[in-house]
Curated annotation (Swiss-Prot):
Protein's organism: Sphingopyxis alaskensis (strain DSM 13593 / LMG 18877 / RB2256)
Binding site for Zn(2+): C15, C18, C37, C40
UniProt-listed SMART domains: AAA, ClpB_D2-small, zf-C4_ClpX
GO molecular function term, any single one: ATP-dependent protein folding chaperone
PROSITE patterns the record matches: CLPX_ZB (PS51902)
Positions that bind ATP: P120, T121, G122, S123, G124, K125, T126, L127
Origin: domain of life: Bacteria
Gene3D superfamilies registered for this protein in UniProt: 1.10.8.60, ClpX chaperone, C4-type zinc finger domain, P-loop containing nucleotide triphosphate hydrolases
Protein name: ATP-dependent Clp protease ATP-binding subunit ClpX
Subunit structure: Component of the ClpX-ClpP complex. Forms a hexameric ring that, in the presence of ATP, binds to fourteen ClpP subunits assembled into a disk-like structure with a central cavity, resembling the structure of eukaryotic proteasomes.
Keyword Disulfide bond listed: no
Taxonomic lineage of the native organism: Bacteria, Pseudomonadati, Pseudomonadota, Alphaproteobacteria, Sphingomonadales
Listed GO CC annotations: HslUV protease complex
GO terms under biological process: cell division; proteolysis involved in protein catabolic process
Chain's gene name: clpX
Keyword terms, alphabetized: ATP-binding, Chaperone, Metal-binding, Nucleotide-binding, Zinc
Length: 423
């Protein structure tokens, strides 16, 4: 469109889309009776690229990634847990294969298989779910089950999970309906008592009931601005039928329930009291059955919505040492990169890595505790580093990890002397 400038007789041209004048943009392209500026062209290109990119885009031919391809990608970021990776890879492949063939009108309708991850704290449950979503390029959100309550009670509504998924897809409902939801700490919403109670359990059984419909597939009415503060807002309708739900939890004490079942343990006078099981918790969890989850406090309908169960083992010293150094985004690699930015090399000796792993096992924090241990070791060094001159390398050995000495600083002149001696 053309508007006349009030200050002079010359006409000023304006973008038909954003309304900016030719003086406010770099380029204005003319069409029959319309104009478009370079900024709007760039925005349109971004929108088109985003639309093309949407969906499961791990392969160029558009096919759903095979279980082997999914598992190989998980191997690059997650150490160990091979059984859990295989279970996840098959379940996710089948889920997105089901979506790819959903519109063909065949007689056999494929049901959705949500996934339950059971394993100790710091064994990699959350990392597996995050890595999967990143590889598949689908919207992903995490929810903490401990903050959820039934609608109408103080706490977070279950529908807020779908709102977070919508936000991660930029409110693209179509994309959100093919996303992945990871619900952490699912064991914390177990029923407080094994038998149903007449009192209302709004953060336990009540949340399980509220999650049931979402997980099996329903049309959820989601408030774009959050639950209760904006009652007049229009609701978005999101079909959860094709959203993959992955639930994870440590289920502390579940191994005892499994052990009791396996031993057929009786209760009362004269009952055989079993000694402590020498096997690690992860080994016992491999023999999990749905009835064990019911005894733990999950309701039957909820267990039924999670037909695929993958168990993770607690990590030993060897696995934690590998986690420190082997994955693409390994912790040691991250700190080396930080030191590289200061033009200083960072070296961890092999015995230092073993000592860090042993500390994490003592704290019973698994892989999650590794960062806090390494951070504590390097804190003072990182504080001083920007002001240090002539330091070319920081060396961390076993004595440093165990607190017997500070990280060793190697200065430029000593490094030159060492190089000369070696020659």
């Amino acid at each position: 469109m053309t508007k006349l400038s009030g200050s002079d007789s010359k006409s000023t041209l304006y973008c038909s889309f954003c309304g900016k004048s030719q003086h406010e943009v770099r380029k204005l392209i003319a069409g029959p009776t319309v104009f478009i500026c370079d900024e709007c062209v760039e925005l349109c290109n971004d929108i088109i690229r985003e639309e093309i990119k949407g969906g499961v885009a791990a392969r160029k031919d558009g096919a759903v990634p095979t279980p082997l391809e999914i598992c190989q990608h998980l191997d690059a970021y997650v150490i160990g847990q091979n059984k859990a990776k295989r279970v996840l890879s098959v379940a996710v492949h089948n889920h997105y294969k089901r979506l790819a063939n959903s519109g063909r009108g065949e007689d056999v309708e494929l049901a959705k298989s949500n996934i339950l991850l059971v394993g100790p704290t710091g064994s990699g449950k959350t990392l597996l779910a995050q890595t999967l979503a990143r590889f598949l390029d689908v919207p992903f959100t995490m929810a903490d089950a401990t903050t959820l309550t039934e609608a109408g009670y103080v706490g977070e509504d279950v529908e807020n999970i779908i709102l977070k998924l919508l936000q991660s897809s930029d409110y693209n409902v179509e994309k959100a309906q093919r996303g992945i939801v990871y619900i952490d700490e699912i064991d914390k919403i177990s029923r407080k008592a094994e038998n149903p109670s007449i009192t209302r359990d709004v953060s336990g059984e009540g949340v399980q009931q509220a999650l049931l419909k979402l997980m099996e597939g329903t049309t959820a009415s989601v408030p774009p601005q959050g639950g209760r503060k904006h009652p007049q807002q229009e609701f978005l309708q999101v079909d959860t039928t094709n959203i993959l739900f992955i639930a994870g939890g440590a289920f502390a004490g579940l191994e005892k329930i499994i052990g009791d079942r396996l031993q057929g343990k009786s209760i009362g006078f004269g009952a055989h009291v079993a000694g402590p099981d020498e096997r690690r918790a992860g080994e016992v969890l491999k023999q999990i059955e749905p009835e064990d989850l019911l005894k733990f406090g999950l309701i039957p309908e909820f267990v039924g919505r999670l037909p695929v169960i993958a168990t993770l083992e607690d990590l030993d010293v060897d696995a934690l040492v590998k986690i420190l150094g082997e994955p693409k985004n390994a912790l040691v690699k991250q700190y080396k990169k930080l030191f590289d930015l200061e033009e200083v090399a960072l070296t961890f000796t092999d015995d230092a890595l073993v000592a860090v792993a042993k500390k994490a096992i003592e704290r019973k924090t698994g892989a999650r505790g590794l960062r806090s241990i390494v951070e504590a070791i390097l804190l003072d060094t990182m504080f001083d580093l920007p002001d240090l001159t002539d330091v070319v390398e920081i060396v961390v050995d076993k004595d440093v990890v165990e607190g017997r000495k500070d990280p060793v600083r190697v200065y430029a002149d000593k490094a030159k002397e060492a190089a000369g001696d070696a020659a």
